[in-house]
A protein has these predicted regions:
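Carboxylate- and glycine-rich phosphate/diphosphate-binding segment that chelates Mg2+/Mn2+
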Residues: 112-199
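ATP/NTP phosphate-donor binding region
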Residues: 1-43
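Short, solvent-exposed amphipathic alpha-helical segments in soluble enzyme
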Residues: 2-9, 61, 112-115, 152-154
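Short strand->helix junction
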Residues: 21-22, 104, 145
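Glycine/threonine-rich beta-strand-loop-alpha-helix active-site module
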Residues: 27-140
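Hydrophobic packing residues within well-ordered alpha-helices of enzyme cores
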Residues: 3, 56-59, 186
Length: 199
Protein backbone atom coordinates (compact mmCIF):
# COMPACT_ATOMS: atom_id res chain seq x y z
CA UNK A 1 0.00 0.00 0.00
CA UNK A 2 2.74 2.59 0.78
CA UNK A 3 4.30 1.91 -2.65
CA UNK A 4 0.95 2.38 -4.38
CA UNK A 5 0.36 5.60 -2.42
CA UNK A 6 3.74 6.94 -3.55
CA UNK A 7 3.04 6.00 -7.19
CA UNK A 8 -0.34 7.76 -6.96
CA UNK A 9 1.36 10.82 -5.48
CA UNK A 10 3.79 10.88 -8.42
CA UNK A 11 0.98 10.43 -10.93
CA UNK A 12 2.30 7.08 -12.19
CA UNK A 13 -0.31 4.69 -13.56
CA UNK A 14 -0.12 1.28 -11.95
CA UNK A 15 -2.01 -1.89 -11.19
CA UNK A 16 -1.44 -4.59 -8.57
CA UNK A 17 -1.49 -8.38 -8.75
CA UNK A 18 -1.63 -9.80 -5.22
CA UNK A 19 -2.75 -13.39 -5.73
CA UNK A 20 0.64 -15.07 -5.25
CA UNK A 21 0.62 -17.75 -2.56
CA UNK A 22 3.62 -19.52 -1.00
CA UNK A 23 5.06 -22.06 -3.46
CA UNK A 24 3.67 -20.16 -6.48
CA UNK A 25 2.02 -22.04 -9.33
CA UNK A 26 2.38 -21.72 -13.08
CA UNK A 27 -1.37 -21.14 -13.24
CA UNK A 28 -1.05 -18.14 -10.89
CA UNK A 29 1.83 -16.77 -12.98
CA UNK A 30 -0.25 -17.11 -16.16
CA UNK A 31 -3.05 -15.14 -14.52
CA UNK A 32 -0.61 -12.39 -13.57
CA UNK A 33 0.85 -12.43 -17.09
CA UNK A 34 -2.63 -11.93 -18.57
CA UNK A 35 -2.96 -8.81 -16.40
CA UNK A 36 0.43 -7.58 -17.62
CA UNK A 37 -0.49 -8.09 -21.27
CA UNK A 38 -3.64 -6.03 -20.74
CA UNK A 39 -1.89 -3.26 -18.77
CA UNK A 40 1.43 -3.32 -20.73
CA UNK A 41 3.77 -2.12 -17.96
CA UNK A 42 7.23 -0.75 -18.69
CA UNK A 43 8.32 -1.52 -15.12
CA UNK A 44 7.50 -4.52 -12.94
CA UNK A 45 7.94 -4.10 -9.18
CA UNK A 46 7.97 -7.39 -7.26
CA UNK A 47 7.36 -6.78 -3.55
CA UNK A 48 7.42 -9.66 -1.08
CA UNK A 49 9.34 -12.77 -0.20
CA UNK A 50 10.89 -15.37 -2.47
CA UNK A 51 7.55 -16.70 -3.70
CA UNK A 52 6.35 -13.28 -4.85
CA UNK A 53 9.65 -12.50 -6.56
CA UNK A 54 9.89 -15.93 -8.23
CA UNK A 55 6.32 -15.66 -9.51
CA UNK A 56 7.02 -12.13 -10.80
CA UNK A 57 10.13 -13.37 -12.63
CA UNK A 58 8.07 -16.06 -14.37
CA UNK A 59 5.37 -13.50 -15.25
CA UNK A 60 8.11 -11.23 -16.62
CA UNK A 61 9.42 -14.03 -18.88
CA UNK A 62 5.94 -14.94 -20.15
CA UNK A 63 5.05 -11.26 -20.67
CA UNK A 64 8.19 -10.55 -22.69
CA UNK A 65 8.31 -13.89 -24.56
CA UNK A 66 4.81 -15.42 -24.81
CA UNK A 67 5.89 -17.98 -27.45
CA UNK A 68 8.79 -19.53 -25.54
CA UNK A 69 8.30 -23.17 -24.50
CA UNK A 70 8.33 -23.24 -20.72
CA UNK A 71 9.68 -26.82 -20.51
CA UNK A 72 12.74 -25.81 -22.59
CA UNK A 73 13.57 -23.02 -20.14
CA UNK A 74 13.31 -25.40 -17.18
CA UNK A 75 15.75 -28.07 -18.38
CA UNK A 76 18.02 -29.73 -15.82
CA UNK A 77 21.72 -28.87 -15.98
CA UNK A 78 24.66 -28.63 -13.60
CA UNK A 79 26.26 -25.36 -14.70
CA UNK A 80 24.18 -22.25 -15.42
CA UNK A 81 26.74 -21.23 -18.07
CA UNK A 82 26.44 -24.50 -20.03
CA UNK A 83 22.80 -24.54 -21.07
CA UNK A 84 21.70 -26.20 -24.31
CA UNK A 85 18.69 -23.89 -24.56
CA UNK A 86 19.45 -20.20 -25.08
CA UNK A 87 17.33 -18.25 -22.62
CA UNK A 88 15.54 -15.30 -24.25
CA UNK A 89 16.89 -11.80 -23.67
CA UNK A 90 14.92 -9.96 -21.00
CA UNK A 91 14.18 -6.28 -20.52
CA UNK A 92 12.88 -5.24 -23.94
CA UNK A 93 9.35 -4.60 -22.65
CA UNK A 94 9.81 -4.02 -18.93
CA UNK A 95 12.40 -3.12 -16.31
CA UNK A 96 12.29 -5.49 -13.31
CA UNK A 97 12.64 -4.20 -9.73
CA UNK A 98 12.70 -6.57 -6.74
CA UNK A 99 11.83 -5.30 -3.26
CA UNK A 100 12.24 -8.07 -0.66
CA UNK A 101 10.20 -8.09 2.54
CA UNK A 102 12.08 -11.11 3.93
CA UNK A 103 15.71 -12.12 3.57
CA UNK A 104 15.53 -15.89 3.21
CA UNK A 105 15.67 -16.69 -0.49
CA UNK A 106 17.82 -13.93 -1.90
CA UNK A 107 15.67 -14.02 -5.05
CA UNK A 108 16.23 -10.28 -5.48
CA UNK A 109 19.91 -10.88 -6.31
CA UNK A 110 19.91 -14.34 -7.89
CA UNK A 111 19.30 -15.67 -11.42
CA UNK A 112 16.86 -18.33 -10.21
CA UNK A 113 13.10 -18.85 -10.00
CA UNK A 114 11.03 -21.87 -8.97
CA UNK A 115 7.44 -22.45 -10.01
CA UNK A 116 5.08 -25.42 -9.60
CA UNK A 117 2.72 -26.71 -12.28
CA UNK A 118 -0.40 -27.49 -10.27
CA UNK A 119 -1.82 -29.86 -12.91
CA UNK A 120 1.25 -32.14 -13.07
CA UNK A 121 2.72 -31.46 -9.62
CA UNK A 122 6.10 -30.76 -11.24
CA UNK A 123 8.24 -28.07 -9.63
CA UNK A 124 10.15 -26.25 -12.36
CA UNK A 125 13.52 -24.66 -11.53
CA UNK A 126 14.59 -21.87 -13.88
CA UNK A 127 18.15 -20.60 -13.83
CA UNK A 128 19.68 -18.05 -16.15
CA UNK A 129 21.41 -14.71 -15.69
CA UNK A 130 18.60 -13.11 -17.72
CA UNK A 131 16.39 -13.67 -14.63
CA UNK A 132 18.48 -11.28 -12.53
CA UNK A 133 16.38 -8.27 -11.51
CA UNK A 134 17.52 -4.98 -13.02
CA UNK A 135 17.38 -3.42 -9.56
CA UNK A 136 17.01 -4.66 -6.00
CA UNK A 137 15.80 -2.27 -3.30
CA UNK A 138 16.71 -3.84 0.03
CA UNK A 139 15.22 -1.75 2.82
CA UNK A 140 15.45 -3.25 6.30
CA UNK A 141 12.38 -1.22 7.33
CA UNK A 142 10.38 -3.66 5.19
CA UNK A 143 11.55 -6.52 7.42
CA UNK A 144 11.49 -4.97 10.90
CA UNK A 145 7.74 -5.45 11.30
CA UNK A 146 7.73 -9.04 10.00
CA UNK A 147 6.26 -11.71 12.30
CA UNK A 148 8.87 -13.59 14.34
CA UNK A 149 7.90 -16.87 12.68
CA UNK A 150 8.70 -15.45 9.25
CA UNK A 151 11.99 -14.01 10.50
CA UNK A 152 12.94 -17.40 12.00
CA UNK A 153 12.06 -19.24 8.79
CA UNK A 154 13.99 -16.69 6.71
CA UNK A 155 17.04 -17.00 8.96
CA UNK A 156 17.03 -20.78 8.70
CA UNK A 157 16.63 -20.41 4.92
CA UNK A 158 19.72 -18.17 4.87
CA UNK A 159 21.65 -20.80 6.81
CA UNK A 160 20.43 -23.56 4.47
CA UNK A 161 21.62 -21.62 1.42
CA UNK A 162 24.98 -21.02 3.09
CA UNK A 163 25.36 -24.74 3.90
CA UNK A 164 24.43 -25.65 0.32
CA UNK A 165 27.05 -23.23 -1.00
CA UNK A 166 29.69 -24.64 1.35
CA UNK A 167 28.91 -28.25 0.36
CA UNK A 168 28.58 -27.49 -3.36
CA UNK A 169 30.75 -29.30 -5.90
CA UNK A 170 31.44 -25.85 -7.37
CA UNK A 171 32.56 -24.34 -4.05
CA UNK A 172 35.86 -22.46 -3.92
CA UNK A 173 37.99 -20.85 -1.22
CA UNK A 174 36.22 -17.58 -2.02
CA UNK A 175 32.67 -18.97 -1.74
CA UNK A 176 33.59 -21.00 1.37
CA UNK A 177 34.51 -17.80 3.20
CA UNK A 178 31.21 -16.16 2.27
CA UNK A 179 29.21 -19.25 3.24
CA UNK A 180 30.93 -19.67 6.61
CA UNK A 181 30.49 -15.99 7.43
CA UNK A 182 26.78 -16.16 6.53
CA UNK A 183 26.35 -19.10 8.93
CA UNK A 184 28.20 -17.17 11.64
CA UNK A 185 25.96 -14.12 11.14
CA UNK A 186 22.82 -16.28 11.48
CA UNK A 187 24.11 -17.80 14.73
CA UNK A 188 25.18 -14.42 16.09
CA UNK A 189 22.13 -12.33 15.25
CA UNK A 190 18.98 -14.33 14.47
CA UNK A 191 18.27 -15.04 18.13
CA UNK A 192 18.47 -11.33 18.99
CA UNK A 193 15.27 -10.60 17.08
CA UNK A 194 13.46 -13.89 17.43
CA UNK A 195 14.58 -15.08 20.89
CA UNK A 196 15.33 -18.36 19.12
CA UNK A 197 17.90 -20.64 20.73
CA UNK A 198 20.60 -21.72 18.27
CA UNK A 199 23.03 -24.40 19.42
Amino acid sequence: KPVEDKLDELGIQHTCFSEVAPDPTLQCARKGTDMMRHFEPDTIIAIGGGSAMDAAKIMWVMYEHPDVDFSDMAMDFMDIRKRIFTFPHMGKKAYFIAVPTSSGTGSEVTPFAIITDKTTGIKWPLADYELMPDMAIVDTDNMMSAPKGLTCASGIDVMTHALEAYASMMASDYTDGLALNAIKLVFNYLHVHTKMVLM
